[in-house]
C-alpha cells in the first residue's frame, strides 16, 4: 500500500483523491460548521458526472485519520491509485 502523507502538526483539513480509469473517489477530513470533525467522501465518473457522497462524523482528528487509512486500503484493493495533493505533501 502507498504511504499516506503525514498530517501536519496542527490538525487541519486533509484530503485524498483516488482515481481508477474514469472513476474517482475523494475523502476529506475537516471540521464542519458545528466544529465537529467529519470525513466527507464523494465518488463518481469523470465522463458523465454521476456519483454520490457521504459525510461521517468522527470523534476527533486521530479517528478521522484512522478512517482515511481504512478508506485508502479499500480503494487500493479495488485498483484505485492515490493522487497526492500538494497541500498534503
Task: State the predicted function of each range.
Residues 28-55, 69, 81, 85-87:
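Short aromatic-glycine-(Arg/Gly/Cys) micro-motifs in beta-strand/loop hairpins
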Residues 60-68:
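Short amphipathic alpha-helices within nucleic acid-binding modules
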Residues 1-38:
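Short N-terminal "domain-start" leader segments
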Residues 67-74, 78:
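Conserved short hydrophobic interaction patches
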Residues 10-12, 22, 47, 51-54, ...:
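A near-ubiquitous, low-amplitude feature marking generic local secondary-structure context
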Residues 1-4, 8, 78-89:
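Boundary/linker segments flanking structured domains
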